Amino acid sequence: MDTTNQSEDIKPCDSDLMESILMFDEPISDILAHNKLWISHARTRSNFFPQEGRHISNQHTEAATSLKMWMLSKNLVVIVKRKDDIFPCKILTRNPENLFVARFLESGKEKHIQVEYSDIIMTRSELEKALPLCQHLIPARNWDDFYIIRDFEKATPYFEQGLSALVKPGQQFELQLEDAPDFYVMATVVKNYRGFLLVEYQNFKRWIHMLSPYCHEIGWGKNEKQEYLKRGPYNRHMNVDLVAGLVKQSTNQKLGAVPEIVFRNNCPVPHRIPEYSACVYLDLDQKRFYFAHKVTTKTCRNNRHFFNISIGKNLVTSKQNNRPYEFHVYHPRILPYSVAKRMEVQIILPPDVKLLPDESNLDGYLRTYCNPCDKHKTSDRVQPSPKIAKKKNGPLLLDDTPDAMFRSRPLLGDNIGAHKEWTNFMNHIPDYKRKDLLKSMDTLKFCEIFRPTPTGALQLTAAEVTGQQECMLRLKVSGEDEPVYIHNADPHLYHLGACLDMELAINFHGEFFDEKPLKKNKNANNGFSSF
């Protein structure tokens, strides 16, 4: 089934505008009663059947986790000391009280046991004494997962606190600008809604999640710049500069900086995406998908961490400064074509692509934009012999030149964008929980989402889940006619009932609901509801 299409309505523009909002809309006087009415409607519509929600809004779940559970993640290798018994182990699962680990034995095997958080060595001095006694037990393949002791020393004072509770109004951190990541500013926290932060720098305000890759500890930018200049452009560091004139001291000097440990994982990772690699792009309104490809522009100083994309001839630009927008490899609105195809969504093709006979839209786009040297191409990475006219279960082989068999097709795989975030999330769930999650995913019927209003504010809005597959949801949003697509880990997506936790009025209308209760999806495949 070919679900792609051509359209002349192409407006490639992106700036994460929803992150640049001054305030929430809260027009309801009795917020609590209004929100309870929404919850009652949703539960009645779902026949009071429990909803599965572990696979969505994982950034908010992570921000609410205690620091000790957040840092001691699955597969992390630590050193444990029980009286005179010192041994290394790998974390399997954890709960608020204790940990279930795999102890490495002299025989090379593993023994599953339970340990307390207090049993783990968390100071450098103790580790230096203990490690020589047991390091020979750690398999070579597990050394990459060995814990970083300096991070645990920094975290010790906050170990029992929730992660989001460490960020308080008045504290400061360094914020890398999303529409110009070559620059960063000193930002002050104004509000904290369970990790979703309103921050200000000089006269500007912006919403951003505390676990965004653009949030960093004080001193990050200076250190990053120094390491970049010392090691050269081909390293993991970035060429960033502080925006002049925007340094503003905190109004509450007692609060100072956000604890450094909060941002330990917040940095865009380097990528190796080849030029002209094709992907699918979800627009800023989150309603339309476009064929797109990776390009490099002169405005992007950090090409190892960020890249630009183009929809045909049109660069995706920032609405705020018309500068080519710079994406990181896990950006939630970039999808592999294979995922979009499985979702069976319409993918818009630029109007200047002229399809050849029996040519798919994907092949037409690749031929037109992704390798100017080729007249024809297919979407296959490894080409069969040019004598073969058609590949089984694949597109036509249109290039009959002798070197066609050696050309690789620039089509991005699953390790990018929203799908990569989904994969990382699923890999950290124990096997027995993962199977249960996949079976029950189709019970998710309602959620809450921040949507921009005509006045330029964010409004927490009611939404009904009309389809889901892998890393994406399709939503029917109150007050909007077209479906909205959103990545499971998008920080604007919340569980049902978040309005009560944050005490924000939710936007919903009675006509949004069909009076009939929802029925269970009979077409669900292993817990996935097809779009």
Swiss-Prot record:
The keyword ATP-binding does not apply. Expressed ubiquitously. Coiled coil: none annotated. InterPro entries: Mbt. GO terms for molecular function: chromatin binding; histone binding. Its main location: cytoplasm. One of its GO terms (cellular component) is cytoplasm. Keywords: Cytoplasm, Developmental protein, Differentiation, Neurogenesis, Nucleus, Repressor, Transcription, Transcription regulation. SUPFAM superfamilies: Tudor/PWWP/MBT. It comes from the Eukaryota. This is Sop-2-related protein 3. The lineage of its organism: Eukaryota, Metazoa, Ecdysozoa, Nematoda, Chromadorea. The gene is sor-3.
